[in-house]
Regions:
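Sec-dependent bacterial lipoprotein signal peptides
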Residues: 1-28
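Eukaryotic scaffold repeat domains enriched in small/polar residues
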Residues: 31-450
Length: 450
């Protein structure tokens, strides 16, 4: 949990553990509204600000079951028009029928941990990247390693160890796949990038101005070799207790040093701040508006969670497309909110030092009427966009994901196994982390049946 003291933003040791417990999200832009782009701020103007959508724009509540019914019964609607040079896509219903809808295999093709991963448990696994060979690489922060697997999930090799020498990590952060199946791994502690070859051999180090650039999270490698990054919410002068949103640029990092900011500022996810001691503390607002990004080689998708709308921007932040779909926000029953509060207190009680902060965090936390429209986005290896249903950090992953094709047409919904958090999606397989009832995590691979 973040705290503010005087003019400085800092993490206490207690706060770091609680921030992790709060399921801190990567903070992205929120850039959806009901106006056409010609009527709002554009990405061409210097230091322009994309307005945060008003929560009043949410439509009447619905449920995943209603969407599932629509997947099989509503006719597919799809239109594309131009507005001031920006493509506006509107889609409704589903292109899939009950017979053609995609499904996930009932059992995993591979469940990875222990002996099958060279003795590494993979508990706490981070990002997963898919290689052109069909193999994949798993970031394992707890082991200070990257772990390579072949297309069938067989362990190949691991690279990295704890340390500051070349090829070592103090912290394994984001990893990204590069052309030629090299893998780029960020170490935010020592502010550098390590590049490993397809065989897992360490290739080179590159320094990057991470902290000077606002300690961004790496999202994707762009076609020119630069790295798209996103910034976190930061405390600012004048912020007060309650719900807060910041506006920040995205950042383009140049390997070897240097960075540039997008000219457009984007609102971050919503944060809940409360008075704690002589300053403020806080974290992402549970069930509050969340912003997410999904990168491509040419740009990135943004979604705010406030409306059934996402936007696509070029690498310079320039708005290119608006994608709107027919849908409504899921209602938030009082029972669900109360269960979250109870589960959050139970989690904090297991970490006694964080109990007081959690109690203060929850004391006046508002309960919205509905949940965000999305809880995450992933672009698969074929360019399709997958939108994750929202769940707060105490809730089980899985549920019904919505799929759009590369042209923005809504294809339908795919049910993901309970407890499975997707990290990467290939042409015919899904990769992610599954959490057992006892909290033990393992990496799983499921078939994607089309």
């Amino acid at each position: 949990m973040k705290r503010q003291t005087e003019k400085y933003s800092l993490y206490s040791s207690v706060g770091r553990s609680l921030l992790a417990a709060l399921g801190a999200v990567t903070l992205m832009t929120a850039c959806g509204n009901d106006s056409d782009p010609a009527e709002t701020a554009t990405a061409d103007s210097a230091d322009s600000v994309v307005p945060a959508p008003a929560t009043a724009a949410r439509t009447s509540p619905s449920s995943a079951s209603a969407d599932l019914e629509a997947r099989h019964s509503e006719p597919s609607g799809y239109s594309v028009r131009d507005s001031a040079g920006i493509q506006v896509i509107e889609t409704a219903g589903s292109a899939w029928t009950e017979e053609t809808a995609w499904t996930v295999g009932p059992e995993p093709l591979a469940s990875l941990g222990g002996e099958r991963t060279g003795g590494t448990s993979l508990h706490g696994a981070g990002r997963i990247v898919i290689l052109s060979s069909g193999g994949f690489v798993v970031a394992h922060p707890q082991g200070s390693q990257l772990v390579w697997f072949d297309p069938n999930g067989r362990f190949q090799h691991a690279a990295g160890h704890l340390g500051r020498s070349p090829g070592a990590f103090m912290i394994v952060g984001d990893i990204l796949a590069m052309p030629g199946d090299s893998v780029l791994a960020v170490d935010p502690e020592v502010r550098r990038v390590s590049v490993f070859g397809p065989d897992g051999e360490f290739a080179r180090l590159e320094s990057i101005d991470f902290r000077e650039a606002g300690s961004p999270s790496a999202v994707s490698v762009l076609s020119d070799g630069t790295i798209l990054g996103t910034r976190e919410f930061e405390f600012e002068e004048g912020m007060s207790a309650g719900l807060n949103r910041d506006s920040v640029p995205l950042v383009i990092l140049q390997p070897g040093g240097g960075f540039t900011n997008t000219r457009t500022l984007f609102p971050t996810s919503q944060h809940w701040l409360f008075e704690f001691g002589e300053g403020l503390a806080g974290g992402p607002a549970p069930f509050g508006a969340e912003s997410h990004v999904a990168g491509t080689v040419d740009g990135f998708w943004f979604g705010s969670g406030d409306t059934a709308e996402i936007t696509y921007h070029g690498a310079d932040g320039r708005l290119q497309k608006i994608l709107r779909w027919q849908g409504s926000a899921e209602p938030l029953p009082a029972e669900r909110f109360e269960k979250f509060e109870a589960d959050a207190m139970a989690a904090a009680a297991r970490n006694g030092a964080a109990l007081a902060e959690m109690r203060n965090f929850l004391r006046d936390l508002p309960s919205p009427d509905t949940t965000p429209y999305l809880g995450g986005m992933i672009v698969d290896s074929d360019g399709r966009l997958w939108i994750r249903p929202y769940h707060v950090w105490t809730e089980q992953a899985g549920g019904w994901w919505t799929v759009f094709d590369a042209n923005g047409r809504r294809m339908g919904m795919v049910e993901i196994p309970a407890g499975f958090e997707i990290r990467a999606i290939g042409s015919d397989r899904i990769y992610g982390v599954w959490t057992a009832e006892d909290g033990v995590e393992s990496v799983r691979v499921y078939a994607l049946n089309k």
